[in-house]
Amino acid sequence: MCHLLKLARLVPTLSLLIGCQVAAPARVQAPPDSAAGEISFRLAGPGGAALLVPIYLNGEGPFEFVLDTGATITCVDQPLAERLNLPEQRGQIGLGAGVGGAGRVRLVGIDSLRLGAAEASGLTACVLDLQQVRAISPDVAGLLGLNFLKEFRVTLDFERNILLLQEAD
């Protein structure tokens, strides 16, 4: 019970973006055999409640991201966005909402985001201070959201700690 209460404090951050206006969807590429492959993940946080995956942004990484089906778009921690010099998406408005309130968020462009053999280009992401999320793991650098995940059939094999991405039908 105590672990659940600790995790509940992170929910406003992990599920921050439930609404965001963005211009164009990302272009997604999967390998020709339509299977984007198996990716190892690790569980972290109280009771293993967070699933962490290795992400490559603009050819750099890997960076540890939380797989977050509650996030409409992918989010990058502010220090990483600055380090990678991710360009701000002018003319687009990001609206974030969570248990803690609502407000505007900064949106940036990601040229390429790769998870295993699956890659998206032209992805929009928000920039957040993920300090609270780093309670799960000190290396968390972002949240992998639905603007990437929705393009795939996602299978989680908890027995082997494998995430399987397949091109959506």
Question: Can you say where each PLM-predicted feature lies in the sequence?
Answer:
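Sec-dependent signal peptide recognition
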Residues: 5-13
